């Protein structure tokens, strides 16, 4: 099935973020929720939903999100995404494109992705950021239904994330390029520096084009100090070359990964 979700934001006359345009084909749907009573009070809080039991063989999923200047969007999902079993040679694909205009802010953390036995899932995400925009973007992947003895029973998982800063001359400057490629039949994914004995991997990328490296370094140090208190998770926090940081979390429960991220 070819499915598409496209949404954009606008700023109301009262300074609140609203949906400008919204288009979705099954199984996608988006609903708006009450705003948080904090710094995002004037932002839009929304939930991405799906009526499908999961991602099926041959699915092509396309997500397009565009934030207007000075708008803020917090986008969550309804439930876990399950990539169902597939015949050999079949696969599913998701492409996501996100555009942040000047001084816009986006928080986007979908529920964990669960890779069922014999599944193949590939995703590509490209994010373009305008001046002084802010991004909090994450993903959590489960290596299978562990209680069903599905540890690395999927065929392939790949995730490519590329983030760019938009420049005044119209060109794009690379900020982040992150690639995850899992092929259980060809890789020892339980080896040291891979997944080891953990079952869930979480990734969080934070970028704020209004902050300098010294400010980001303070955030990294504070997060590193907090992470030492977590005993059941393996957490790595790294400062990016400019404007941001990246967090990688390995754990054995989806809830624990979600909470720390």
UniProtKB/Swiss-Prot annotation:
Positions in coiled-coil regions: none
UniProt protein name: Urease accessory protein UreD
Subunit structure: UreD, UreF and UreG form a complex that acts as a GTP-hydrolysis-dependent molecular chaperone, activating the urease apoprotein by helping to assemble the nickel containing metallocenter of UreC. The UreE protein probably delivers the nickel.
Keyword field: Chaperone, Cytoplasm, Nickel insertion
Role description: Required for maturation of urease via the functional incorporation of the urease nickel metallocenter.
Principal location class: cytoplasm
Keyword Iron: no
Compartments, record wording: Cytoplasm
Keyword Membrane part of the UniProt annotation: no
InterPro entries: UreD (IPR002669)
Single GO molecular function: nickel cation binding
Protein origin, superkingdom: Bacteria
Organism in which the protein naturally occurs: Haemophilus influenzae (strain ATCC 51907 / DSM 11121 / KW20 / Rd)
Family: Belongs to the UreD family.
């Amino acid at each position: 099935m070819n499915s598409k979700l496209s949404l954009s934001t606008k700023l109301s006359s009262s300074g609140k973020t609203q949906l400008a345009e919204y288009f979705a084909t099954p199984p996608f749907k988006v609903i708006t929720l009450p705003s948080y009573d904090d710094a995002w009070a004037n932002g839009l809080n929304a939930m991405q939903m799906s009526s499908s039991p999961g991602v099926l063989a041959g699915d092509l999923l396309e997500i397009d999100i565009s934030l207007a200047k000075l708008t803020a969007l917090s986008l969550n999902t309804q439930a876990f995404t399950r990539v169902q079993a597939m015949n050999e040679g079949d696969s599913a694909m998701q492409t996501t494109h996100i555009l942040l205009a000047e001084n816009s802010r986006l928080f986007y953390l979908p529920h964990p992705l669960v890779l069922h036995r014999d599944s193949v899932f590939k995703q590509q995400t490209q994010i373009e950021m305008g001046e002084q925009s802010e991004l909090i973007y994450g993903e959590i992947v489960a290596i299978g239904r562990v209680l069903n003895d599905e540890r690395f029973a999927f065929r392939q998982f790949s995730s490519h994330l590329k983030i760019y800063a938009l420049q005044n001359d119209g060109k794009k400057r690379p900020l982040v390029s992150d690639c995850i490629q899992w092929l259980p039949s060809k890789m020892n994914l339980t080896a040291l520096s891979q997944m080891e004995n953990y079952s869930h991997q979480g990734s969080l990328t934070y970028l704020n084009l209004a902050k300098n490296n010294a400010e980001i370094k303070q955030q990294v140090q504070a997060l590193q100090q907090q992470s030492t208190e977590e005993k059941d998770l393996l957490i790595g926090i790294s400062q990016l070359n400019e404007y941001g940081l990246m967090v990688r979390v390995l754990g054995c429960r989806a809830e624990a990964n979600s909470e720390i991220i």
